[in-house]
């Protein structure tokens, strides 16, 4: 199902001297290293846009996958900083993509994608949350940034693509 695509679509290249994680998923980079007994490199394309003319090594690395129709920006920072940013940017068509339980403190309409400390919930809720934003007619979305390690790396990678790599430090 689309809800579990964050976990199912993991890609690892064994074509070179060192394994390369091209697309993170449920099995973390650290777990792969333990199981394989060697270092696993993280492809630059996991956290950054491909450079002009650079070829994608795996499907899903090149395009803005799963993005809603709205413009999405990831906001990196504390919840207090996110809340202040939302207060100054709340307008018609602006939505918060936040963690479950945060919505009462936010001034804009909200769609949640799991609890802040539960990347497994985030992984299962992210795509349906993005579709919900479409259904509600969101024009602009400011997303809370998930963690960037372990299983949450997969969530962050998919959200980065939905945001076309737009990230703002708050």
Label each region the model flagged.
Residues 168-170:
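Short, flexible loop segments at boundaries between secondary-structure elements
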Residues 8-13:
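Short beta-strand scaffold segments in enzyme catalytic cores
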Residues 14-41:
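A conserved active-site cap/scaffold subdomain adjacent to cofactor or substrate pockets
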Residues 1, 15, 25, 44, ...:
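Residues at the C-termini of beta-strands that transition into short coil/loop
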Residues 28-29, 47-49, 79-80, 102-103:
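Short, catalytically relevant binding-site loops at active-site mouths
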Residues 43-63:
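Long, charged amphipathic helices and adjacent flexible linkers at domain junctions
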Residues 56-164:
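A C-terminal functional module that forms or caps the active site or interfaces directly
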Residues 2-7:
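Short, small-residue-biased leader/transition segments that mark boundaries at the very start
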């Amino acid at each position: 199902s689309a809800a579990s695509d964050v976990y199912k679509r993991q890609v690892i290249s064994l074509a070179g001297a060192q394994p390369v994680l091209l697309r993170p998923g449920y099995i973390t980079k650290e777990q792969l290293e333990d199981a394989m007994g060697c270092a696993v490199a993280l492809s630059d394309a996991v956290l950054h846009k491909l450079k002009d003319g650079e070829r994608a090594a795996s499907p899903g690395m090149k395009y803005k996958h799963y993005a809603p129709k709205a413009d999405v920006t990831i906001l990196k920072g504390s919840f207090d900083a996110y809340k202040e940013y939302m207060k100054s940017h709340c307008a018609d068509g602006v939505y918060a993509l936040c963690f479950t339980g945060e919505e009462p403190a936010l001034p804009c309409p909200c769609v949640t994608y799991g609890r802040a400390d539960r990347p497994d919930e985030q992984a299962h809720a992210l795509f349906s949350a993005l579709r919900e934003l479409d259904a509600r007619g969101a024009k602009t979305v400011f997303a809370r940034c998930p963690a960037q390690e372990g299983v949450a790396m997969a969530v962050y990678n998919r959200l980065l693509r939905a945001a076309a790599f737009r990230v703002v430090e708050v």
